[in-house]
């Protein structure tokens, strides 16, 4: 059961067209595993954009919490953090203006939560970059939406993972000159 069905169920109980027991049955299947829900809500949106910025490893935005790949990625992330310390690479070296722009364009391409605009502008500000709404509007007008995930469709974050995740999205955006891949 996706969250939209659950939200609708709550309204149906209030309207008297569904029983509380029926709603409870929906609740029991809404988010059946650990991790976030499978829709493109704030948690998954920011996870994908954190990957785009470069503050998490490729694949981290879409690998489900219950997969072995997530455990392997966690180990790899720990190793990478130690390398970054040795290399004296700081978040300010990673969160560049171009990385923020890439994240904003990726946001538009995959239809992230509207909350991401608040988070991305705050991240940009903290990193010393000035991103205003006019610039965001320009990105939105020029960046194609290349996929729609739940709640905008019946496609879930796990489906995006199955077709290559954020690296695949970024590759498509780079083909169109929408982003510049950052090593």
Question: Where do the language-model regions lie?
Answer:
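Catalytic or ion-coupling anion/metal-binding cores of large enzyme and transporter domains
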Residues: 1-183
């Amino acid at each position: 059961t996706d969250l939209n069905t659950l939200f609708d169920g709550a309204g149906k109980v209030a309207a008297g067209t569904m029983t509380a027991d029926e709603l409870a049955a929906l609740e029991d299947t809404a988010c059946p595993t650990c991790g976030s829900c499978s829709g493109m809500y704030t948690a998954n949106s920011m996870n994908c954009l954190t990957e785009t910025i470069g503050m998490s490893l490729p694949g981290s935005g879409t690998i489900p919490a219950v997969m072995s790949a997530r455990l392997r990625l966690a180990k790899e992330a720990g190793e990478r953090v130690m390398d970054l310390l040795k290399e004296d690479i700081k978040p300010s070296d990673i969160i560049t203006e171009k990385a923020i722009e890439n994240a904003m364009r990726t946001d538009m391409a995959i239809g992230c939560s509207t909350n991401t605009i608040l988070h991305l502008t705050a991240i940009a500000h903290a990193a010393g970059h000035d991103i205003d709404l006019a610039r965001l509007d320009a990105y939105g007008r020029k960046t194609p939406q290349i996929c729609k995930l739940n709640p905008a469709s019946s496609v879930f974050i796990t489906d995006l993972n199955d077709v290559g995740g954020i690296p695949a999205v970024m590759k498509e955006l780079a083909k169109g000159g929408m982003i510049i891949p950052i090593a």
